[in-house]
Amino acid sequence: MGGNEAQNLAAIQRGFEAFAKGDIETLKTLFSPDANWNQAEAGVLRGNYRGVQALLEFFGQLAHETEGSLRVEVLTMAASGDHVLVFERVTGERKGKTLDTKEALVFKLDSGIVTEVTELQSDYPTAAQFWS
């Protein structure tokens, strides 16, 4: 399990770059076939997304719900064993509402491939209001 920390950090960095560009083909290569994304916030996107296709649909729904305005800025990234922690700023607009919040993503990897992601909000009420 795990792989080395540098390999895991590089994989997550590639993922953020691919997400920003809408590079679906690269994103597909970074997740295990049964990867799980736990989206704990309230609102239309809450839930667990399992499998590459479900994750890609989730990413597409993020873009759709925000009419392409969603932006993610990585503030810091750190690796420990088979985990990478990303602290990020997320901005966007949706149905006349504006989002500007910070959140943490905890990625679990196996040899540079993401197997699990847990998303944690720093301001749950703001995120819940935006996505409701």
Q: Where is each model-derived feature located?
A:
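A short, polar/proline- and glycine-enriched secondary-structure boundary/capping micro-motif
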Residues: 48, 96-99, 126-131
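Short beta-strand segments that buttress and anchor functional surface loops
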Residues: 61-62, 86-93
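Short, low-complexity N-terminal intrinsically disordered segments enriched in polar/charged residues
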Residues: 1-33, 128-132
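Short beta-strand edge/turn micro-motifs at domain boundaries
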Residues: 105-128
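Beta-strand elements of well-folded, non-transmembrane domains
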Residues: 20, 92-94, 111
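Hydrophobic/aromatic beta-strand elements that line small-molecule binding cavities or substrate pockets
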Residues: 72-77, 89-91, 102-107, 118
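Short, solvent-exposed coil/turn segments at beta-strand boundaries
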Residues: 34, 79-83, 107-115
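A solvent-exposed, acidic/Ser-Thr-rich amphipathic alpha-helical stretch
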Residues: 28, 32-79
